[in-house]
Structures are given as C-alpha cells and as structure tokens.
Swiss-Prot record:
Organism name: Trichoplusia ni
Name the UniProt record assigns to this protein: Acyl-CoA Delta(11) desaturase
Enzymatic class: oxidoreductase
Gene label: D11DS
Family named by the database record: Belongs to the fatty acid desaturase type 1 family.
Annotated PANTHER family: ACYL-COA DESATURASE, DESATURASE 1, ISOFORM A-RELATED
Lineage: Eukaryota, Metazoa, Ecdysozoa, Arthropoda, Hexapoda
Amino acid sequence: MAVMAQTVQETATVLEEEARTVTLVAPKTTPRKYKYIYTNFLTFSYAHLAALYGLYLCFTSAKWETLLFSFVLFHMSNIGITAGAHRLWTHKTFKAKLPLEIVLMIFNSLAFQNTAITWAREHRLHHKYSDTDADPHNASRGFFYSHVGWLLVKKHPDVLKYGKTIDMSDVYNNPVLKFQKKYAVPLIGTVCFALPTLIPVYCWGESWNNAWHIALFRYIFNLNVTFLVNSAAHIWGNKPYDKSILPAQNLLVSFLASGEGFHNYHHVFPWDYRTAELGNNFLNLTTLFIDFCAWFGWAYDLKSVSEDIIKQRAKRTGDGSSGVIWGWDDKDMDRDIKSKANIFYAKKE
C-alpha cells in the first residue's frame, strides 16, 4: 500500500497557466433532418428484447454460477471501456506496458462498443466539441438522442467534418489496437458472445437458452451503463467546476460505470487519470484498478491535477457546489458567510 501511495504522489500535475487557458465550447444545436439506419433499429430492438428475456431468466432458471460469471464479465467489460478505451487510449491519462494493453484490449473486445480506435476517435471529438453538432452524441438534442438515438441515424455533417481534424496518429499506430481492428469480427464475436455462451454450457451445465440470453443481458446492460455517461451525466447533477457546460456530477452513473459519472470534473480536466477530484473511493473502481496496475508495474506516468488548480477553477467557473463542508468550523467554510451567520440565544461572554 505504501508503494501504491507513493505511486499516486508521484503522478504528474498540470501547470496553473495551462488550466487557466482551457476554454470549453458552449452547448448548442441546430435543427436537422434525420436519416435513419433501419438495420441498427432492428439490431438494437432484438438485442434489448432478448436482454430483457435474459434478465427474466436470471430470476427464474439460471444457475448461480452463470450469474456470478456474468457479474465478473460485466466488470471486466466495464474496465475495458473505462480504463482502456477511455482513460488510456482516448485521453492518455496514463501509460500502459504491453501486458496491460493486451488485457485491456481483450476486456474492451468483451464490451463490444465498436473497436477501441473508433471509440477513441468519437470520444475525442465529443470532448473537443461537446454538446454541439460536431459531438457524435450531442446532449443538447435530449436524453434519448444522446443515450442511443445517435446510433440510429446518420451522423451530422459536422461530426464528419470536424472528425477529420482530430489527431489520431497515436491510436492508429498502436499495434495492439491495430490488431483488434484487423481481426474485429472474429475477435469480438468470440470474446463478447461465443465464449460467454459456451463456458456456462460446457463448464457447469447451463442451458443454451439461458447462456445465450444472459450473455446478451450482460452485454446490453454494460452498453446502457456507458450510454448513461453520455445522457444522464450530461443532464442531471451539480456542476462544481464549470457551470457553463452540460456535463454534471452524477453519483448513480459513477456507481454503475465504475467512476465515470464525475462528469463535470472530467470535462474540465480530461487528462486526470482519476476523472474525479476524489478519485480514490468505492465509486471509482477504475481508478483503484489503475492504481493497482501502477503498483504492479504495468501502468506508469499517471497524470492528475493539483488541489490548488482544482480549487481555483471551481471558484472561477463552478456553480458553488464544490464548497461542501461537514458543518461549523470546517476549514473550508467561507469566512464571510461565517461572520454574517445568525446565532440565536448566543452565550454572553
């Protein structure tokens, strides 16, 4: 634990001058005519209906081994998105040695949210032009569009236009991700669907019907958890670091998505590997995973933002909700507020 603490203390901090120059794009949208992708409608409809049936089977006939297996796979796929596609390959918040990259690529294939290369390109674009027409899942268009609707229609022309301006050279030249992209169909088909179905059947005698539909439930549930970061975490929650943007702090999303719901912080400081001011907590399992990998020697150059810069940014652009205190005499309590507080039946000195 001492080594882990030392690792966290040695993470890089961002210069104050850099933090002050960050300007976020204001949310906006313009009217558009949607061009629907009907094959996606059919695919998503079947997958969600089958997943609901899988949920029913979880409570009626599935073996406990299958449920435990699916629970473990869910967290593995979560890590493949949060630690792999998101914090490592999109935002470069830390560096990973080859064994960790391979593990995260396999976990990412288990999640099947396109290839990691495509995921990173769209997510970099999302941050660069957040909640505008150049954002693939523009939350200014509402909950449904930012949750799943954006996958059911053709991309906005601005997404295609500005997507070409995003530097993706590091991701395109990553040999692990090039391998995933080259063999995407057999790799993802095997890791995400075939093995999660075959293992329960042949290892503990689960029925084919249960194994397949519960595998789909695990996949669709994980998919919607990620979608909630794009939708719910851009609509509901407080904004302690920048009140001018849509991303907000959403504890429920953080719980489900292994720490990805501290979204107002993340959009202000996307280079922080913790994605939260208080990254080391039970809601942020991804940070704990990265810290463990750093202790193990597989992750290094973990980047974080200094406490002073966080406080300065919150004071300058936040909605005031960062000043949470435990009560009277908390060291963070505003002195002016304290001096002007009403005190009834005050004891006379």
